[in-house]
């Protein structure tokens, strides 16, 4: 029996998630990708983290900022604490507890930045204005750019070759429990409406990942993922409606179609890569990494980092100012 990965509705079994060092995963169990999706494919988690990055610490900070029930907020904060993202620290003389981002939690800043940048560029309508991002190093508003850590050049999906590593497989990479969007519909789109359409369901996230790894035909997605055909059809249709995939007739078979990432879909690559990088730093399988990447341009193992599009220098979390817009 392998440990069940934690989800937003329940803690992990038997695994310890230290706030300052990686989780040691069980052999043959859910890998880093599965744990990462279990945590990030939940809109409430992302919203809680968004405000934590901006300075929220007390329960009341999130309660006042979000249309969230007491039960859901309590459950999500407990889950993120269990996963080592928050730690409880006393304040007001020890009578109350604050939720402080740990080293593991603070390390999520690249994921949030790339989500905000993608939503700002490709999604026209948001209930709440996306935050302003300022690079303290050059003093200007910026958009993060994904570059190769080895050579410093910007990369797109076609520039990076990916494959499963020693702990990688589709069965180990999909969270055991279905992930979901908000537990309580508010009647309006969230801060990350299309991000959650892409990764807010375990099969959606898996289909997007398969597309980045080269899946094109319906048969590719079905064979690689093992998802129900109706589920794959529904997700492919949604991705086409969002403009993330384009549907094209297969050569010589006009009755069949292939699915290719559009410019909008390819622009989501930094989100996927920063999320995977965070997961593989903080969830370690004994067999080795779940995914390995090579930069075709320089031939080195690919490890991404974010750079400022205005001055070109690598970004550090301490040099990024996140401000709410009035």
Q: How would you describe each model-predicted region?
A:
Residues 71, 78, 82-87, 96-150:
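DNA-contacting interfaces and partner/effector-binding or oligomerization modules
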Residues 2-16, 120-184, 284-326:
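C-terminal regulatory/oligomerization modules of transcriptional regulators
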């Amino acid at each position: 029996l392998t440990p069940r990965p934690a989800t937003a509705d329940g803690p992990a079994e038997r695994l310890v998630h230290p706030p300052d060092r990686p989780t040691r995963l069980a052999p043959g169990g859910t890998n880093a990708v599965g744990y990462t999706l279990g945590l990030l494919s939940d809109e409430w988690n992302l919203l809680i983290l968004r405000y934590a990055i901006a300075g929220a610490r007390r329960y009341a900070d999130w309660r006042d900022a979000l249309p969230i029930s007491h039960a859901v907020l309590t459950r999500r904060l407990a889950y993120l604490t269990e996963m080592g993202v928050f730690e409880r620290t006393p304040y007001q003389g020890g009578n109350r507890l604050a939720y402080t981002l740990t080293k593991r939690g603070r390390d999520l800043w690249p994921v949030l930045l790339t989500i905000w940048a993608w939503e700002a560029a490709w999604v026209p309508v948001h209930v709440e204005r996306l935050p302003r991002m300022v690079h303290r190093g050059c003093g200007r508003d910026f958009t993060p750019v994904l570059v190769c850590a080895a050579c410093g050049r910007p990369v797109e999906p076609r520039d990076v070759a990916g494959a499963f590593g020693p702990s990688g497989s589709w069965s180990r990479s999909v969270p055991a429990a279905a992930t979901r969007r908000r537990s309580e519909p508010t009647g309006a789109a969230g801060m990350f409406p299309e991000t959650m359409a892409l990764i807010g369901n375990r099969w959606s996230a898996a289909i997007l990942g398969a597309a980045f790894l080269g899946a094109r035909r319906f048969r590719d997605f079905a064979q690689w993922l093992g998802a129900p055909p109706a589920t794959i059809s529904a997700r492919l249709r949604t991705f086409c409606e969002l403009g993330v995939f384009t549907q094209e007739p297969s050569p010589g078979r006009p009755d069949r179609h292939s699915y290719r990432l559009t410019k909008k879909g390819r622009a989501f690559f930094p989100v996927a890569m920063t999320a995977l990088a965070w997961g593989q730093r903080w969830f370690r399988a004994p067999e080795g990494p779940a995914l390995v990447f090579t930069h075709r341009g320089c031939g080195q193992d690919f490890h991404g980092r974010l750079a400022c599009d205005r001055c070109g220098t690598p970004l550090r979390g301490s040099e990024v100012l996140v401000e709410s817009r009035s």
